[in-house]
C-alpha cells in the first residue's frame, strides 16, 4: 500500500471511529461523495459547538493523533489534529467549530446552515475500495462553499460537481447573499475556458472523456445564464 492509500485508509478508519459523533464532512472528501474521487490532503469537518469538538478530539487523540496549535480567526474557531504515518507522511483533520470562515473573502457561514443543508451519503475514496455512510454537506451547499472561496482547487471541484447540482437558482441566491456572484462566476468562467484547464483537471482527477468534460462545462455556463431571482430562490429552496 503506497502512502496515498495509507492516508485514505487512515482517514476512513478515523471517520468510522467518529460515527457516533454529530458532524458534517465538507471539503475534498465531501466532493468525493458526488463526483469522481480525487486525493485530498486532509479531512474537514464542521461541528456545532465546543463540547462536540472536545468529544471528537478525545477519539482522535486516543487513535494516535496530536492536537496542533492553530491561529485564532476572530470568527469561528478550528482545531487541527495530525498523525504521522509512513515516515512522516501526515494525515490531518480540521475540526471547524460553530461554522466556516473563508479567509479569501472573510465570509462566515454558521454551522446550523451546514447541518441544515447536509445528508447522509456513501463516502468513497480514490485509491481504496472501502465505503462508509456519513453526514456530508449536500451538493448544492458544497457548490456554494466552493464558489465563495473560488481558489484554483475549488474551481476544479466546481467543474466536477456541476452536473450533479439540483437547484441552480438557490445556489445563485446563497452566493449572492454573501459576496458578488458575478465576480465569482467571472473567475470560474475564465479558469474553465483557459487552454490549460483540462490538462490541469486531469492531473488531479485522472483522465476525463471529452463528452464528460463538455457536459460539466455546459452545466457551469448554464449557472451563469440562470435568471431566477436570488432572493426568491433563497426563500423557496427545499431543505434536505
Residue ranges and their predicted role:
Residues 1-240:
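Compositionally biased terminal segments of proteins
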